[in-house]
Amino acid sequence: DVLGGINHPVAQEWAWARPFDIRHVTPALYVDPAPETENRNMVWMKTFTPLADDPALHRAALTYASDYTLLEPILRQHGVAWIQPGMSVASLDHAMWFHRPARVDQWLLYVQDSPSAQGARGLGTGAVFTEDGTLVATVAQEGMIRLPEGAAARRARVRGAAQRMALRTVLR
């Protein structure tokens, strides 16, 4: 939705080359940080194309998709966006519990929270619901988010401001 209109190879890759259509309910963090530091992120997601009627395939696809945005509540608490220059991000572990079968080629609501985010680490938890509100899976992930310090942080802020201005111009 946001990235599809940006004429840049990375934006186009994120928008169209991945197999999932992801629509943010809460403001997307691609360019700008959230206006307020909060610990909640919500997206609707589904595959772009229909999948076969294999429950194992749908579980595998949901596991894959669950990693796309689970660090975003942690980014929100740190007050940064994905474009933050000099930021290092990594998933440290990822666990998933399946409660009921679900089709990932139909819209699923992924509600994510971060009960703890400090010291370059954070815990992201998520719940995946069908359109009728049925809970189908629960997710937990610990992530690392390192921001540059000192002079590197000052240089990164200048680069980040320039990049955000350029991307905002493209988005208009």
Which sequence ranges carry the predicted segments?
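Terminal targeting signals and extreme-terminal segments of soluble enzymes
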Residues: D1-R172
